[in-house]
């Protein structure tokens, strides 16, 4: 990265894996020293632009992994895009709910000290305008679920 300070271009090396708000020091490019002392260092505050797919938690990258209702119920093998442009094939376990985490080891941010993982969080997606066949299948599924109450303990847990 090249920045201009006082009209002069200065090269700044941004290390891999730098976090938002961290500072990079450029030795000898700060203000002149007093009484003939050495020139000070320039500190550059880094702002990391948010990514449309990935967010960062420590050295881990986190993303939503859209899956269909049938993939969540039955399980599926899907490709996940990696930040380096490659893909990783992962298994969505049968019975996954939204929020289920699938970890790809070594798919996160690499720093001088460690490499994080990519965490793909299952995000069940339903069609905005389901067709007649999907509605019919959903009604059959509702009947098959019988008395299943997925919110049975919600009110009690909310009071704790």
What are these model-derived regions, one by one?
Residues 1-160:
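Non-catalytic interaction modules of co-chaperones and other macromolecular assembly/maintenance factors
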